[in-house]
Amino acid sequence: MSTTAAGTVPDVTPTRERADVRVAAPAGGLRGVLESSPFPILLVSLVGILLLTAFGPALVVGDTWLMLMAGREVVDHGLPETETLTVLGSGATWTDQQWLAHLVVYGTHALAGIRAVVVLDVLLVVGGLALALGAARAAGATSRSTFLVGLLAGLAGPGGWPMRAQATALPLFAGVLWLLLDAARRGARRRTLLVLPALVVWANLHGSVLLGASLTTVLGVYELVRARRLDWLPLSLAVLAPLCVLATPYGWDVVAYYELMLVDAPFAEILREWQWSSPGGTTARVPSPSARAGARARRPRRRRSRPRSAPSPEPASRRR
């Protein structure tokens, strides 16, 4: 209804047209991801159920028992500095960079047994996957594409499912990535600084913290260059992120550990996972289908100006 000098004039705008004008604002943050992402939520649920029902026993591997043993050493004797558990390595320097992961797994086993360790592993894997999918959705990826890429990632990385020290870092990696992606799109804010305490915890769980620290430093430098002025927030990210790697009880001595693992890995000649990543038959199994699918999606569709001709008969030499 509208009021004029002549009186009240009824609003004759069609109901359908008025309904089209009112567009609901999309929900943001975690709520928006949960409300509009049925496919990623389905994937996370399926992975969790699959791990608990079908792959539960397979999640306990040799590294799991190593974590339990190392965690017991931390509880009984404090942080190790010299190797005393094996004959071949007796007397060698032992920098237990993953001491916190070992302690958490040992404490879980001491409280509720090996089944609780399996449940903890499932929670870590599913939590990391959920955060990664949430980061993709928050960055603008569609629900279906997030589901498909997440499914391919799950098929490509079952080696990361067992209870190992790296499993404890999965939620931290995904959470740090989410914060960095948000800062890259909207600019660094105060909540971006949550990356720093996450890196400190990560530095005591697994050596992959170098990846998170490197990405954080790159973002800080990028924000400084883009702003063309010294802003304390991106400067803090660029300077403090590398220092978070040293925030362990071992302090500066942990540098020698990373040098050994990254430059001169002792098992690189016999274990593939210790080698540098390179294209090969193993790495091409899953990326190849996804790459072909991406190429098809990017290929422009052209309208045919003439009808499709009948296929030519196959040569006799090819039919043999």
Which positions does each model-derived feature cover?
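Start-transfer (signal-anchor) and selected internal transmembrane alpha helices
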Residues: M1-L52
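Transmembrane-helix signature of polytopic, membrane-embedded enzymes
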Residues: S45, A132-L155
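Membrane-interface alpha helices of multi-pass inner-membrane proteins
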Residues: L50-L51, A153-G157, R191-G207, L240-V245, ...
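Transmembrane catalytic cores of multi-pass membrane glycosyltransferases
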Residues: D63, V75, P80, G207-P307
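Short hydrophobic/aromatic helix or loop-helix immediately within or flanking a transmembrane segment
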Residues: L88-R115
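Transmembrane-helix motifs of polytopic, lipid-linked glycan transferases
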Residues: V119-A139
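Short hydrophobic alpha-helices at membrane interfaces in multi-pass membrane enzymes
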Residues: R144, D182-V200, W232-S236
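Membrane-interface transmembrane helices that cradle and orient dolichyl/undecaprenyl
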Residues: V176-R191, A293-A297
